[in-house]
């Protein structure tokens, strides 16, 4: 919601077109369409396999479709921007750089003349952005997408670029920060692989991946991020997943 929540309001208020990536536009329309709808059984199966309790499943059902209720309606048409495009804003040229993993097609804007990077959530100074799997694509591997995007960003922007993030203050040291993020996730994957010496559910791996307490307010995000790490290990051929009595176990 913090990506797109006021886009519809701005477009209507100032009579301007919405410019964004195709996949993110369609994904937002899809999420907004869930408002008022019943929870798909695939979604319930997804979180049941992950090991959520009946109380947590009930909590998810009660919150299902909230996205559309907290954003302004998106325009029914938009102008697509994609990786490699160069767009003009107030007479300055900005290169569009795609990042994947946090969203499907996150667009950063880089001005070579100003040496500025509007990084959105693709590069933050303190925290790492959420990289999670959702019920609509349960076998997705967004973490490898995220890591590849970080590596590509190192090649596309200079080390001394001034980064304007979506959260936190502007900062310098883009390459160093990107390498820190990559190393953080690779270390988490190594720890997780060791932890899976015996079969574990998705919810069992929270202590390996998260320092903060997981409660009713963040367990869905934690579950999605845990599955992202597990799916990454599966795709790398390092762990396997087996279903036993509707619960998924990883080892």
Where are these regions (language model features)?
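Residue-level signal for the nucleotide or nucleotide-sugar donor/cofactor binding architecture
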Residues: 5, 141, 221
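Short, contiguous alpha-helical
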Residues: 12, 99, 234
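Short hydrophobic/aromatic-enriched beta-strand-loop microsegments
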Residues: 15-20, 118-120, 181, 216
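Aromatic/hydrophobic pocket-lining residues that form the small-molecule binding cavity
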Residues: 4, 146, 150, 226
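C-terminal regulatory/interaction regions
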Residues: 190-251
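Active-site HxH/HxHxD metal-binding segment of metal-dependent hydrolases
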Residues: 1-87, 115
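Metallo-beta-lactamase
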Residues: 67-78, 86, 93-189, 202
């Amino acid at each position: 919601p913090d990506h797109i929540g006021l886009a519809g309001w701005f477009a209507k208020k100032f009579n301007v077109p919405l410019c964004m990536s195709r996949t993110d536009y369609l994904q937002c329309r899809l999420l907004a369409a869930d408002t008022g709808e019943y929870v798909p059984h695939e979604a319930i199966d997804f979180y049941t396999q992950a090991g959520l309790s009946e109380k947590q499943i009930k909590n998810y059902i009660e919150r299902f479709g909230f996205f559309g209720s907290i954003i302004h309606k998106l325009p029914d048409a938009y102008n697509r921007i994609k990786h490699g495009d160069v767009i003009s804003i107030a007479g300055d040229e900005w290169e569009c750089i795609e990042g994947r993993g946090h969203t499907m097609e996150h667009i950063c804007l880089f001005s070579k003349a100003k040496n500025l990077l509007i990084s959105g959530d693709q590069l933050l100074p303190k925290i790492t952005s959420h990289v999670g799997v959702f019920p609509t694509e349960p076998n997705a591997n967004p973490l490898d997408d995220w890591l590849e995007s970080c590596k590509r960003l190192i090649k596309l922007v200079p080390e001394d670029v001034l980064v304007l993030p979506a959260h936190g203050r502007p900062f310098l040291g883009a390459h160093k920060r990107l390498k820190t993020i990559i190393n953080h996730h690779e270390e988490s994957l190594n720890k997780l692989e060791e932890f899976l010496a015996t079969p574990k559910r998705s919810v069992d791996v929270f202590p390996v991946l998260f320092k903060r307490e997981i409660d009713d307010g963040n367990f869905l995000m934690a579950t999605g991020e845990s599955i992202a790490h597990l799916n990454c290990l599966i795709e790398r051929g390092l762990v396997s997943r087996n279903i036993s009595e509707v619960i998924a176990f990883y080892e």
